[in-house]
Design a protein with these regions (language model features):
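Conserved HGGG/HGGXW glycine-rich cap/lid loop of the alpha/beta-hydrolase fold
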Residues: 7-54
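Active-site loop/oxyanion-hole signature of alpha/beta-hydrolase fold enzymes
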Residues: 42-84
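Gly/Ala-rich beta-loop-alpha elbow adjacent to hydrolase catalytic centers
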Residues: 85-89, 93
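Flexible "cap/lid" loop of the alpha/beta hydrolase fold
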Residues: 98, 105-139
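Conserved alpha/beta-hydrolase catalytic His-Asp/Glu region
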Residues: 142-197
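Short beta-strand/loop motif that positions the catalytic acidic residue
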Residues: 200, 206-208, 212
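Conserved alpha/beta-hydrolase "acid-adjacent" motif
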Residues: 213-219
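Catalytic histidine-centered segment of alpha/beta-hydrolase-like enzymes
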Residues: 237-250
């Protein structure tokens, strides 16, 4: 795969989704940096996840945006930034772009969903409800194991075969356990967030998996239609595009079109 060196932002922020952490990007980060030599990736965790797992997760995304900005200030990293954000992380990016458009030069939103452009049964496909409710019930009865949870998440979010990933995710779960209370608080924040009616002032690209088993591709299609921003679809990858097809994702990050509201 040819390296990409032109017209690509140099300072990237990567954000994951609900109860996921920066470690879940796995080998995609070094792969991206190897393909885009001038780019530097900064991984952020949302409060309650990853290195910040001991903090209380906010129930509003505004506080998550401010946490991201504070983490970057603490690290001495000044804007502007480009953002790659997955799922709930994309909601954080959208609010960031709305409140502080001068800080972002590009946002790439992957397999996300937002009110009022997505129905509740599109934001989480009904076939996953039984799995999640069963695991929650077993968790309350102290019968669900971490391996059962992570294996279920892997099945719901990927379309490929990734046996090595499960062990890596179990290690992350042990190192940075997300509390049930924080998971519910994050779910609340994602559920009540309402996307701005006006398309972002920041150049925006939507990426989605046509066969996403977790979130319906209709969510990204609805957002693309409402905002009149480009949407590129992967024909067979699952929700976790970075895991299922990192080559395709890098290609879109470097050459996919973006549209600005300016």
């Amino acid at each position: 795969m040819a390296k990409h060196t032109t017209s690509v932002p140099t300072q990237w922020i990567f954000l994951r989704g609900l109860v996921r952490e920066s470690g879940h990007w796995g080998p995609f980060v070094p792969f991206f940096e190897s393909q885009v030599p001038n780019a530097r990736v900064h991984l952020l965790d949302l409060p309650g996840n990853g290195a910040l797992y001991t903090l209380t997760s906010p129930t509003h995304l505004k506080a998550m945006v401010e946490s991201c900005r504070q983490q970057l200030r603490n690290a001495g990293l000044d804007p502007p930034y480009a953002v790659l954000a997955l799922s709930m992380g994309a909601m954080v990016a959208v609010l960031w772009a709305h409140d502080y458009p001068h800080e972002l030069v590009r946002q790439v939103l992957v397999n996300t969903s937002m009110r009022p452009y997505s129905a509740f049964y599109e934001r989480l496909r009904p076939r996953n409800w039984v799995t999640i409710l069963a695991l929650l019930a077993r968790t309350l009865l102290r019968r669900a194991t971490g391996q059962q949870w992570e294996a279920a998440v892997l099945r719901m979010t990927t379309s490929g075969h990734h046996p090595q990933v499960l062990q890596a995710w179990l290690l992350l779960r042990t190192a940075h356990p997300v509390s049930t209370a924080n998971a519910l608080r994050q779910l609340c924040a994602a559920a009540i967030f309402k996307a701005p009616a006006r398309r972002p002032l920041v150049p925006t690209l939507l990426l989605a998996s046509t066969c996403d088993g977790l979130v319906s591709v209709r969510c990204s299609r609805g957002l693309a239609h409402a905002w009149q921003v480009p949407l590129l679809e992967h024909p067979h990858a699952g929700h976790d595009l970075a895991l299922d097809d990192p080559h395709w994702l890098v290609q879109q990050l470097c050459h996919g079109g973006v549209t600005s509201g300016r």
